[in-house]
Amino acid sequence: MSEAAASQTKIVTACIVVIGNEILSGRTSDANIAYLAGELGKLGVRVMECRVIPDVEATIVATINEVRARFDYVFTTGGIGPTHDDITADSIARAFGVGISEHPEAVARMSRHYGDPALFTPARRRMARVPHGATLVDNPISVAPGFQMENVFTFAGIPMIVESMFQSMKHRLVGGDPVLSRTVRTNLPEGVIAEPLGALQKRFEDLDIGSYPGFRAGKVSVSLVLRGTDDARLVAATNELIDTIHKMKGEAEELAQ
Protein backbone atom coordinates (compact mmCIF):
# COMPACT_ATOMS: atom_id res chain seq x y z
CA MET A 1 0.00 0.00 0.00
CA SER A 2 1.37 3.43 -0.91
CA GLU A 3 1.65 6.21 1.65
CA ALA A 4 -1.15 8.05 -0.17
CA ALA A 5 -3.44 5.02 0.01
CA ALA A 6 -2.59 4.43 3.64
CA SER A 7 -3.42 8.03 4.48
CA GLN A 8 -6.86 7.58 2.94
CA THR A 9 -7.72 4.63 5.18
CA LYS A 10 -10.47 5.69 7.55
CA ILE A 11 -9.93 4.24 11.02
CA VAL A 12 -12.72 4.44 13.59
CA THR A 13 -11.87 3.24 17.09
CA ALA A 14 -13.72 1.94 20.12
CA CYS A 15 -13.12 0.94 23.72
CA ILE A 16 -15.21 -1.57 25.66
CA VAL A 17 -15.55 -1.07 29.41
CA VAL A 18 -16.92 -4.01 31.39
CA ILE A 19 -18.18 -2.87 34.79
CA GLY A 20 -18.77 -5.36 37.58
CA ASN A 21 -17.23 -6.81 40.71
CA GLU A 22 -18.58 -10.21 39.69
CA ILE A 23 -16.29 -10.25 36.65
CA LEU A 24 -13.20 -9.24 38.62
CA SER A 25 -13.90 -11.84 41.31
CA GLY A 26 -14.08 -14.63 38.75
CA ARG A 27 -17.64 -15.49 39.72
CA THR A 28 -18.93 -14.54 36.27
CA SER A 29 -17.20 -14.90 32.91
CA ASP A 30 -17.53 -12.03 30.46
CA ALA A 31 -19.17 -12.91 27.15
CA ASN A 32 -19.79 -9.39 25.88
CA ILE A 33 -16.33 -8.33 24.69
CA ALA A 34 -16.11 -11.01 22.00
CA TYR A 35 -19.61 -10.28 20.75
CA LEU A 36 -19.22 -6.49 20.63
CA ALA A 37 -15.75 -6.65 19.08
CA GLY A 38 -17.00 -8.97 16.35
CA GLU A 39 -20.07 -6.88 15.55
CA LEU A 40 -18.13 -3.62 15.60
CA GLY A 41 -15.52 -5.06 13.28
CA LYS A 42 -18.24 -5.79 10.72
CA LEU A 43 -19.15 -2.09 10.82
CA GLY A 44 -15.57 -0.92 10.36
CA VAL A 45 -15.08 0.04 14.01
CA ARG A 46 -11.86 -1.26 15.53
CA VAL A 47 -11.85 -2.18 19.20
CA MET A 48 -8.47 -0.90 20.37
CA GLU A 49 -8.82 -1.43 24.10
CA CYS A 50 -10.96 -3.31 26.65
CA ARG A 51 -11.13 -2.65 30.37
CA VAL A 52 -12.71 -4.52 33.27
CA ILE A 53 -13.34 -2.28 36.28
CA PRO A 54 -15.16 -2.57 39.62
CA ASP A 55 -18.44 -1.07 40.75
CA VAL A 56 -16.63 1.92 42.22
CA GLU A 57 -17.90 5.36 41.25
CA ALA A 58 -14.54 7.12 41.23
CA THR A 59 -13.04 4.40 39.03
CA ILE A 60 -15.96 4.48 36.60
CA VAL A 61 -15.87 8.27 36.35
CA ALA A 62 -12.12 8.41 35.75
CA THR A 63 -12.19 5.58 33.23
CA ILE A 64 -15.08 6.99 31.21
CA ASN A 65 -13.55 10.46 31.06
CA GLU A 66 -10.25 9.00 29.90
CA VAL A 67 -11.51 6.67 27.21
CA ARG A 68 -14.24 8.88 25.76
CA ALA A 69 -11.53 11.42 24.95
CA ARG A 70 -9.27 8.83 23.32
CA PHE A 71 -11.65 6.75 21.23
CA ASP A 72 -14.42 7.47 18.75
CA TYR A 73 -16.86 5.22 20.62
CA VAL A 74 -17.08 3.77 24.11
CA PHE A 75 -19.34 0.87 25.08
CA THR A 76 -20.00 -0.02 28.71
CA THR A 77 -21.70 -3.16 29.98
CA GLY A 78 -23.07 -3.83 33.44
CA GLY A 79 -24.30 -1.87 36.43
CA ILE A 80 -27.65 -0.46 35.26
CA GLY A 81 -29.92 -2.89 37.10
CA PRO A 82 -32.26 -2.34 40.09
CA THR A 83 -29.93 -3.04 43.03
CA HIS A 84 -27.85 -0.78 45.25
CA ASP A 85 -24.57 -1.73 43.57
CA ASP A 86 -25.85 -0.80 40.10
CA ILE A 87 -24.15 2.59 39.97
CA THR A 88 -23.11 2.92 36.34
CA ALA A 89 -25.80 5.43 35.33
CA ASP A 90 -25.03 7.71 38.29
CA SER A 91 -21.30 7.43 37.63
CA ILE A 92 -21.63 8.33 33.95
CA ALA A 93 -23.82 11.30 34.85
CA ARG A 94 -21.05 12.46 37.16
CA ALA A 95 -18.42 11.88 34.45
CA PHE A 96 -20.33 14.22 32.14
CA GLY A 97 -21.10 16.70 34.92
CA VAL A 98 -24.88 16.40 34.60
CA GLY A 99 -27.76 15.37 36.79
CA ILE A 100 -29.75 12.16 36.61
CA SER A 101 -33.47 11.49 36.84
CA GLU A 102 -36.27 9.32 35.49
CA HIS A 103 -36.69 9.57 31.73
CA PRO A 104 -40.40 9.99 30.88
CA GLU A 105 -40.27 7.64 27.91
CA ALA A 106 -38.39 5.01 29.91
CA VAL A 107 -41.03 5.23 32.65
CA ALA A 108 -43.83 4.92 30.09
CA ARG A 109 -42.29 1.87 28.44
CA MET A 110 -41.68 0.12 31.73
CA SER A 111 -45.15 0.96 33.04
CA ARG A 112 -46.68 -0.67 29.98
CA HIS A 113 -44.38 -3.65 30.34
CA TYR A 114 -45.23 -4.38 33.98
CA GLY A 115 -48.91 -3.48 33.67
CA ASP A 116 -49.76 -3.74 37.36
CA PRO A 117 -48.39 -0.62 39.15
CA ALA A 118 -47.54 -2.83 42.13
CA LEU A 119 -45.04 -4.68 39.96
CA PHE A 120 -43.33 -1.46 38.89
CA THR A 121 -41.49 -1.22 42.19
CA PRO A 122 -39.16 1.59 43.30
CA ALA A 123 -36.22 -0.72 42.61
CA ARG A 124 -37.38 -1.26 39.05
CA ARG A 125 -38.02 2.47 38.61
CA ARG A 126 -34.30 3.01 39.23
CA MET A 127 -33.73 1.47 35.81
CA ALA A 128 -35.70 4.34 34.22
CA ARG A 129 -33.10 6.86 35.47
CA VAL A 130 -30.65 8.19 32.90
CA PRO A 131 -28.21 11.11 32.84
CA HIS A 132 -29.70 14.41 31.67
CA GLY A 133 -29.27 14.81 27.93
CA ALA A 134 -29.00 11.07 27.27
CA THR A 135 -30.71 9.31 24.38
CA LEU A 136 -32.36 5.99 25.15
CA VAL A 137 -31.08 2.71 23.73
CA ASP A 138 -33.92 0.25 23.18
CA ASN A 139 -34.04 -3.02 25.08
CA PRO A 140 -36.31 -5.38 23.09
CA ILE A 141 -35.97 -8.16 25.67
CA SER A 142 -36.65 -6.73 29.13
CA VAL A 143 -37.63 -3.13 28.22
CA ALA A 144 -35.43 -1.27 30.77
CA PRO A 145 -33.33 0.84 28.39
CA GLY A 146 -29.68 1.57 28.03
CA PHE A 147 -28.61 5.05 27.00
CA GLN A 148 -26.20 7.12 24.93
CA MET A 149 -24.27 10.13 26.17
CA GLU A 150 -22.37 11.66 23.25
CA ASN A 151 -19.97 8.89 22.14
CA VAL A 152 -20.60 6.66 25.17
CA PHE A 153 -23.15 3.84 24.92
CA THR A 154 -24.25 2.15 28.13
CA PHE A 155 -25.71 -1.35 28.05
CA ALA A 156 -26.87 -3.86 30.64
CA GLY A 157 -24.55 -6.74 31.51
CA ILE A 158 -26.62 -9.79 30.53
CA PRO A 159 -25.25 -11.02 27.18
CA MET A 160 -28.64 -11.60 25.55
CA ILE A 161 -29.70 -8.06 26.43
CA VAL A 162 -26.37 -6.60 25.31
CA GLU A 163 -26.87 -8.23 21.93
CA SER A 164 -30.41 -6.92 21.56
CA MET A 165 -29.40 -3.41 22.66
CA PHE A 166 -26.51 -3.33 20.21
CA GLN A 167 -28.68 -4.47 17.32
CA SER A 168 -31.22 -1.77 18.16
CA MET A 169 -28.67 1.07 18.03
CA LYS A 170 -25.94 0.02 15.60
CA HIS A 171 -27.46 2.22 12.88
CA ARG A 172 -26.21 5.21 14.89
CA LEU A 173 -22.58 4.23 14.35
CA VAL A 174 -20.43 5.58 11.54
CA GLY A 175 -17.69 3.09 10.79
CA GLY A 176 -14.47 3.25 8.87
CA ASP A 177 -13.03 0.87 6.33
CA PRO A 178 -14.08 -2.71 7.20
CA VAL A 179 -11.33 -4.88 8.62
CA LEU A 180 -10.81 -7.99 6.50
CA SER A 181 -8.97 -11.13 7.56
CA ARG A 182 -7.41 -14.30 6.21
CA THR A 183 -6.26 -17.32 8.20
CA VAL A 184 -3.60 -19.88 7.32
CA ARG A 185 -3.20 -22.99 9.44
CA THR A 186 0.16 -24.76 9.55
CA ASN A 187 1.82 -27.66 11.33
CA LEU A 188 5.06 -25.71 11.79
CA PRO A 189 5.69 -24.70 15.44
CA GLU A 190 5.81 -21.01 16.33
CA GLY A 191 9.52 -21.25 17.07
CA VAL A 192 10.15 -22.34 13.50
CA ILE A 193 7.84 -19.89 11.75
CA ALA A 194 8.61 -16.88 13.96
CA GLU A 195 11.53 -15.42 11.98
CA PRO A 196 9.94 -15.53 8.49
CA LEU A 197 6.66 -14.32 9.99
CA GLY A 198 8.44 -11.30 11.45
CA ALA A 199 10.05 -10.58 8.10
CA LEU A 200 6.66 -10.79 6.40
CA GLN A 201 5.22 -8.30 8.89
CA LYS A 202 8.00 -5.83 8.04
CA ARG A 203 7.19 -6.10 4.33
CA PHE A 204 3.48 -5.63 5.00
CA GLU A 205 3.48 -2.99 7.72
CA ASP A 206 -0.10 -1.97 6.90
CA LEU A 207 -1.37 -5.41 7.97
CA ASP A 208 -1.66 -6.99 11.41
CA ILE A 209 -0.20 -10.49 11.40
CA GLY A 210 -0.69 -12.70 14.44
CA SER A 211 0.27 -16.23 15.44
CA TYR A 212 -2.05 -18.36 17.59
CA PRO A 213 -0.80 -21.83 18.65
CA GLY A 214 -2.93 -24.78 19.63
CA PHE A 215 -3.38 -28.50 19.16
CA ARG A 216 -5.39 -30.30 16.51
CA ALA A 217 -5.82 -34.06 16.54
CA GLY A 218 -3.12 -34.23 19.20
CA LYS A 219 -0.56 -32.39 17.09
CA VAL A 220 0.83 -28.86 17.07
CA SER A 221 -1.28 -26.49 14.99
CA VAL A 222 -0.66 -22.79 14.50
CA SER A 223 -3.23 -20.39 13.06
CA LEU A 224 -1.67 -17.40 11.33
CA VAL A 225 -4.16 -14.55 11.04
CA LEU A 226 -3.66 -11.59 8.70
CA ARG A 227 -5.91 -8.56 9.10
CA GLY A 228 -6.18 -5.31 7.17
CA THR A 229 -8.43 -3.09 5.08
CA ASP A 230 -6.87 -3.72 1.65
CA ASP A 231 -7.95 -7.08 0.23
CA ALA A 232 -5.29 -7.08 -2.49
CA ARG A 233 -2.57 -6.64 0.10
CA LEU A 234 -4.08 -9.41 2.21
CA VAL A 235 -4.09 -11.78 -0.77
CA ALA A 236 -0.48 -10.94 -1.61
CA ALA A 237 0.71 -11.45 1.96
CA THR A 238 -1.28 -14.66 2.36
CA ASN A 239 0.12 -16.14 -0.84
CA GLU A 240 3.65 -15.21 0.19
CA LEU A 241 3.10 -16.78 3.62
CA ILE A 242 1.81 -20.03 2.14
CA ASP A 243 4.75 -20.16 -0.28
CA THR A 244 7.19 -19.61 2.59
CA ILE A 245 5.65 -22.42 4.65
CA HIS A 246 5.85 -24.82 1.71
CA LYS A 247 9.52 -23.93 1.17
CA MET A 248 10.09 -24.84 4.82
CA LYS A 249 8.51 -28.27 4.13
CA GLY A 250 5.47 -27.39 6.20
CA GLU A 251 1.77 -27.81 5.55
CA ALA A 252 -0.35 -24.71 4.87
CA GLU A 253 -4.12 -24.58 4.68
CA GLU A 254 -6.02 -21.36 4.08
CA LEU A 255 -9.24 -21.50 6.07
CA ALA A 256 -12.57 -20.30 4.74
CA GLN A 257 -13.64 -16.93 6.14
Name each model-derived stretch:
Residues 244-257:
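Conserved short beta-strand edge segments in small beta-sheet-based binding/regulatory domains
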Residues 34-87, 93-94:
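N-terminal small/polar loop signature for handling phosphorylated ligands or for N-terminal nucleophile
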Residues 151-244:
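An accessory alpha-helical subdomain
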Residues 19-21, 76-84, 157, 227-229:
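Glycine-rich beta-strand-to-loop/alpha-helix junction loops that act as flexible
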